[in-house]
Amino acid sequence: MDISIADLRLDYNLEELLESETSADPFIVFKQWLERAVSSGRLEPNAMTLATISPEGKPRARMVLLKDFDPRGFVLFTNYHSAKGQELIANPNAALVFWWGELQRQIRIEGTVEKISEEESDNYFFVRPWESRLGAWASNQSEVISGRDILEKRLTELKEEYAGREVPRPPHWGGFRLIPSLIEFWQGRPSRLHDRLCYYRQEDGSWQRQRLAP
């Protein structure tokens, strides 16, 4: 089947994004938008693109899951030895993007990351399914392996080792919090004249909101 990518287009006309109807606090807006995405029935509405910077200064991006947020920032979990973990440790500048196509909405976030506390990482790790906790031990994330059988063999060994027991959190596994300096909300509109409200964090911790041309 031939696909004409140039002809793929959608008319955005679901909603509008107005200052008069939007909170001055971007975290309140984010919560409202996330709740709407969850109620829409979208598969994994907490999925987001995480962009990092490689040691060579090149951008890298992949999908991850948001696992918590509050006025301090947005939390994700990973293996600290993984490519993204090492990149975030070496260069804390990062960006997140949420795309909810059914709602014709996007959120773009820029900021810097920091490791969350050991206690916070423990609290999340121990609510994960038992086999997911084993998986954190089984995989040396981002390392080259000869085949999947290596992972399956290691998982089987760990199941035997921890049968009937709690699985501890690996010291190399935990969370990062992205502390935002910019949060932009995008709502699709007709004629490609989309609504964009961008919040910029000020030195005193407050937020300045500005409308951007689409």
Swiss-Prot record:
Listed GO biological process terms: pyridoxine biosynthetic process
Cofactor stoichiometry and binding remark: Binds 1 FMN per subunit.
Enzyme Commission no: 1.4.3.5
Pathway: Cofactor metabolism; pyridoxal 5'-phosphate salvage; pyridoxal 5'-phosphate from pyridoxamine 5'-phosphate: step 1/1; Cofactor metabolism; pyridoxal 5'-phosphate salvage; pyridoxal 5'-phosphate from pyridoxine 5'-phosphate: step 1/1
Enzyme class, broadest EC rank: oxidoreductase
Binding residues for substrate: R9, L10, D11, Y12, K67, Y124, R128, S132, R192, L193, H194
Stored PANTHER family: PYRIDOXINE-5'-PHOSPHATE OXIDASE, PYRIDOXINE-5-PHOSPHATE OXIDASE
The protein's role, per its UniProt record: Catalyzes the oxidation of either pyridoxine 5'-phosphate (PNP) or pyridoxamine 5'-phosphate (PMP) into pyridoxal 5'-phosphate (PLP).
NCBIfam families with a match to the protein in the record: pdxH, PRK05679.1
Name of the protein: Pyridoxine/pyridoxamine 5'-phosphate oxidase
Source organism: Microcystis aeruginosa (strain NIES-843 / IAM M-2473)
